[in-house]
Amino acid sequence: MTTETRLEADSIGTMEVPAEAYYGVQALRAKQNFPITGTKLHPVFIRNLAQIKKAAAITNNNAGLLPEDKADAIVRACDEVIAGKLAEEFIVDAIQGGAGTSANMNMNEVIANRAGEILGCPKGSYKMVHPNDHVNMAQSTNDVIPTAGKLTVLDLLAPLEKALARLEKELAKKAEQFDDVITMGRTQLQDAVPIRLGQVFHGYASMVSRDRKRIEKAHREMYTVNLGGTAVGTAINVSDSYFYKIVPNLEKLTGYPLKQAEDLFDATENLDGFVAVSGVVKTCAVDLSKMCNDLRLMSSGPKTGFGEINLPAKQNGSSIMPGKVNPVIPEVVSQVAFHIVGHDTTITMAAEARQLELNAFEPVVFCNLFESITTLEKAVDTLIVNCITGITANRKHCKDLIESSAGIATALCPHIGYKASATIAKTAVKTGKSVRELVLEQGIMTEKELEEVLDPYLMTEVGEERKEDEARRKAC
């Protein structure tokens, strides 16, 4: 590894920079100033920031402000960054002071040095291509960083949406597979009334569908960008040609239906769009954690718990208890949800803390939001592959639970009244006798009447299902 350095200067002073580095003095200062998380800028964010620099170079060249040779070199350097060829040159921490200036200058320096190299200049000279004058022409950290953030959110949401669509599909399959499995529904963890296991999973599928649609709608929050507004939304140092063409040119590069904000002051100051996206991601995570709590309960045991379903055995569960298997996949999904809830709180506080014309805390918003989206997508993927697809039902045990529960006494209420039904239920719990047995013993109803009234499948039919079944019975 070379120890040679070059001397670079900025408004703070001079500094030795590794001779072969494409980053420069400002990125190096930022690395030294912010040794915070050890997490670098998200690679998708880096790619999108380079897309913006590319669009800016094209737009400035078309406006006659950036010479052809410089523009071509900048575009070529941007393409290399977009392809991931210079990934190690982005050295600043994801969480940094300065509203993202360090990230922006890290990009400007890398592109300037690579573009200058293409034009025959040594790294650090900046004679042909300057980080500020050429790469950052007609831009400010305050419009390129939030725009890159929005593009990154859009890129990251796409695989999450696909994962949720797969999860919804797998849950729907389980709903169909378990439609004839009847178990005891519980409210507040106490026996309630019968429910089909298929209905339980259908409810999960509907929940995931709703979350997926919320996330799809959240896209709209990200399509409006403040690019062209520069520092505070006044578009200072921006030509008319650049102002009106930069967003359409970026739209062509990204494929997203971007539009320039009508109120650039608002779009520069406020981060409510990111708060909204974080909120729907958090909501989805909370919903999935709730489902995973249910899966852990329903699979508990195997002998002294609920034992209604079996989760795939994925790994040994104990270093001391032989044969123990834990519900590790639902557990990790819930932990991801806890993590995301914390991120959402951070994002909320950072958005609230903005002052006057700019929010200085975009870096922590982006760091947390990007991680929330990517970890949730990975959690959904492992939930599908390592849990949902392999779930099986303990049919006999579910049937035994129904037959032994006093909860089915609820079905007697329309026929013998609430008070009498409650007495039957209490007696069943006290004596251990079944509801059916007690009703017959007391001569309250006949066996034939009970066959229909206490039919657990009929108890679980809803709406049209019930009408169709009644019609079939009458026809017989």
Where do the protein language model's features map onto the residues?
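Conserved, well-structured ligand/cofactor-binding cores
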Residues: 1-476
